[in-house]
């Protein structure tokens, strides 16, 4: 087997990172079995250093039980590890623990996973896999007896959403809205909760656009209001066109089912985290071999 093939085989068998596999093979004279032992012996020592790395991949998961819905994001460094069964088991363990213990957003940081605070709970897995593993964030929605919760996690675990509505409705209705929210990713539930600073920046952008377009000053105010209204409708969940029935807004779809949206959160893996440029597998191996 070539060195690249050995690296690939070792990575598949151990889920260790590319660089760690190369180091292990170099230290073991390209003997895969010895390299596996090397990884086990050296992993724990280097795990702490891995925590300095940027974890931009991972999964987002959503689930509800009784009157509680939980949304979490757990990060790793590559999509390869994001599909690893040990990583997925860890993420789901956090999800289940949150469903059992979390009552407000602050409780996420108090969770104990495998006997360790959640902030440290990924260290053992980091040592085993060779990538930074970390719980990033979580949200909770709770329903009273007259409300209904909806959750949706896409099958690739890359996007997910939770929603709370006033009214007792079928699970399919709220799941449809959660699915829509996960797909369309609106910034806000409705205009009442729109961030004023964000809105001011959007208005400023429109004003600058009009200056470049040379629009008549007499029509500027009307144009600004029109474009701003369009932006609000695109970014507020209740004002968006429902993807299954575009003639209806989400607000109208829920109203037709005797419900009103009152709470909403959605996550996408790695959003807001600066990502390094991606390399092909061959380029990554070549780069590591030069070190």
From Swiss-Prot:
Matches recorded under InterPro entries: EF-Ts_dimer_sf (IPR036402), Transl_elong_EFTs/EF1B (IPR001816), Transl_elong_EFTs/EF1B_dimer (IPR014039), Transl_elong_Ts_CS (IPR018101), UBA-like_sf (IPR009060)
Molecular function as annotated in GO: translation elongation factor activity
Presence of the UniProt keyword Cytoplasm in the record: yes
Segments of this protein annotated with the region Involved in Mg(2+) ion dislocation from EF-Tu: 78-81
Keyword Cytoplasm: yes
A Gene Ontology cellular-component term: cytoplasm
Origin superkingdom: Bacteria
Disulfide topology: none
Localization: Cytoplasm
Keywords assigned: Cytoplasm, Elongation factor, Protein biosynthesis
Family of this protein: Belongs to the EF-Ts family.
Task performed by this protein: Associates with the EF-Tu.GDP complex and induces the exchange of GDP to GTP. It remains bound to the aminoacyl-tRNA.EF-Tu.GTP complex up to the GTP hydrolysis stage on the ribosome.
Protein name from the UniProt record: Elongation factor Ts
Protein species of origin: Ureaplasma parvum serovar 3 (strain ATCC 700970)
Taxon lineage: Bacteria, Bacillati, Mycoplasmatota, Mycoplasmoidales, Mycoplasmoidaceae
Gene that this polypeptide is encoded by: tsf
């Amino acid at each position: 087997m070539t060195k690249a093939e050995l690296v690939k085989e070792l990575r598949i068998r151990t889920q260790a990172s590319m660089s760690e596999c190369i180091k292990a093979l170099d230290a073991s004279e390209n003997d895969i079995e010895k390299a596996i032992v090397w990884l086990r012996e050296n992993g724990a020592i280097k795990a702490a250093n891995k925590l300095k790395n940027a974890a931009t991949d991972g999964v987002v998961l959503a689930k509800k039980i009784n009157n509680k819905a939980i949304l979490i994001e757990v990060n790793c460094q590559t999509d390869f590890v994001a599909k690893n069964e040990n990583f997925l088991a860890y993420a789901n363990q956090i999800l289940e623990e949150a469903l059992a213990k979390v009552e407000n957003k602050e409780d996420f940081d108090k969770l104990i996973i495998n006997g360790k605070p959640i902030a440290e709970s990924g260290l053992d897995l980091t040592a085993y896999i060779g990538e930074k593993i970390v719980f990033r964030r979580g949200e909770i929605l709770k329903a009273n007896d007259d409300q209904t919760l909806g959750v949706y996690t896409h099958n690739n675990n890359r996007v997910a959403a939770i929603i709370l509505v006033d009214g007792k409705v079928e699970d399919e209705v709220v799941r449809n809205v959660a699915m829509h929210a996960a797909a369309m990713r609106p910034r806000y539930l409705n205009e009442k909760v729109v961030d004023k600073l964000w809105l001011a920046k959007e208005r400023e952008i429109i004003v600058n656009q009009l200056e470049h377009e040379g629009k008549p000053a007499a029509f500027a105010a009307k144009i600004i209001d029109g474009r701003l209204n369009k932006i609000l409708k695109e970014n507020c969940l209740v004002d968006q066109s429902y993807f299954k029935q575009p003639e209806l807004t989400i607000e109208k779809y829920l109203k037709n089912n005797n419900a009103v949206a009152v709470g909403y959160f959605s996550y996408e893996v790695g959003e807001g985290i600066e990502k390094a440029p991606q390399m092909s597998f061959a380029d990554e191996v070549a780069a590591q071999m030069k070190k």
